[in-house]
Amino acid sequence: MDKQEAKHINMPSPSACEHKSVEAYLFIDPLCKDCWEIEPFIIKLWLEYGKYFSIRHIVTGKVDGTNASSHKWNKPANIRFVWEKTTSLQGFSCDGKVHMQEASSTPYLVSMAIKAAELQGRKAGSKFLRKLQEYIFLENVSNPDCELLLACAKDSNIDVEEFKKDLHSASAKKAFQCDLKFTNEMHITEIPSLVFFHANSDEEGIKIAGNYSYDVYVQLLKELVKCEIEPEPLPPLEVLLEATQFISSKEVAFIYDCPQQEIERELKKLQLKRKVQMIEVKCERYWKWIAKEKDLV
């Protein structure tokens, strides 16, 4: 979710602390499940502390091998490594190098698609990414093709014709190359990785690699903001559902820190009011926000 979307979920007004004093960068591979599983943490952090930081997704996928010579950067990163852990990652090399692959390959095409969607705005890019991850991890789509990417564009309500034009455009390619360069400069060796920088300071950044408890992310944010910060009240359940459009009971329970059984009672009330539709996927319950009667499909 970005700043534009946040206004629909009652984000708080600025306090005595400097507004948006921290910049956060989430390094992801859209084909990695760990990057899908960190999203509820990011949503909760944004809802509670979003007035203190901005966030941007950085894609760490594969680059077209025809331009390999232009992707060798060795600029030192002004960053403090807080945690590094090794895990078995899906489709990502952890040797710190930018690897090359044919432009027709799935990782490259998917990365270009995310950048193409982002050309319509950060909110559009985030919606497209979430929809793409739903296809990959909930419907077991291991090799997203052009047809599926166009379906994601349509489902995320972005301009499909504009997306088609941008998918192989120089602008999308340049945006992806910038992400690869930034990934290399930050010495990202594990995904997901979250990097925090103070927006108005030359101090070193803080990087956390891998998935951790929510309190760890809050602790690091507080360390950079350097003043007392308190979480804002979470939005009403209906507002969250409308903003996310499609979310699991487990994710909602985590965000509101409530037992899943209690959350599902509230969700079923909304189902009776025909505001959400329950969809079972892989033994988990997901909830689709119904904007109009025709969405009941």
From Swiss-Prot:
Primary localization: cytoplasm
A GO cellular component entry from the record: cytoplasm
UniProt keyword list: Cytoplasm
Record bears the keyword Protein biosynthesis: no
TM segment ranges: none
InterPro entries: Adapter_SpxH, Thioredoxin-like_sf
Compartments in which it is found: Cytoplasm
Keyword check for Cytoplasm: yes
Pfam families the record matches: Thioredoxin_5
Function in brief: Adapter protein required for efficient degradation of Spx by ClpXP under non-stress conditions. Interaction with Spx stabilizes Spx and exposes the C-terminus of Spx for recognition and proteolysis by ClpXP.
Family that this chain belongs to: Belongs to the SpxH family.
Complex formation: Interacts with Spx.
Record protein name field: ClpXP adapter protein SpxH
Species of origin: Bacillus cereus (strain ATCC 14579 / DSM 31 / CCUG 7414 / JCM 2152 / NBRC 15305 / NCIMB 9373 / NCTC 2599 / NRRL B-3711)
